Amino acid sequence: MKKLLTALMILAAAATLKASTDGYVMLSVFSPGQIPIAATSLNGVRLNALYGECQNLNGLDVGLVGRVRENVNGLQIAAVNSVGTDVVGAQLGLVNFVEADFAGFQFALWNDVGATAKGFQLGLVNRANALEGLQIGLLNFIDDPQQTCRCLPIVNFGW
């Protein structure tokens, strides 16, 4: 009876951990080889050796390649940063991709925002669907036909 009760308590604790979708620290070599799993929303720090993935990130993301399926609020530092929806904060890397809105600062060789970029993009190539801010780079693109300056070298801006 004592062994059964102990086994049930361990099973209940494991189920609680598995059901939790929030984490404070994530360590990753290559997804799915990460703790906790990619479906986790992270409120803290993620360290990626090669590739890490999570649902949402509020905090710091450091590594080689970082993928966030939904939203980022914080700082991403990686060779490649990729976000499925919105970013509020900063991205520092070689390549930064944001599929929806971005608000903050991007620094990379290539910065790409799928919707509106609000803030500052500094890179070799900068692209945004719409821009409320400043782009500084060799090539700067704004896809929105409403913008006055859609493609400019060195400096581009939109309001």
Language-model segments: residues:
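C-terminal segment of classical bacterial N-terminal signal peptides
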Residues: A13-A19
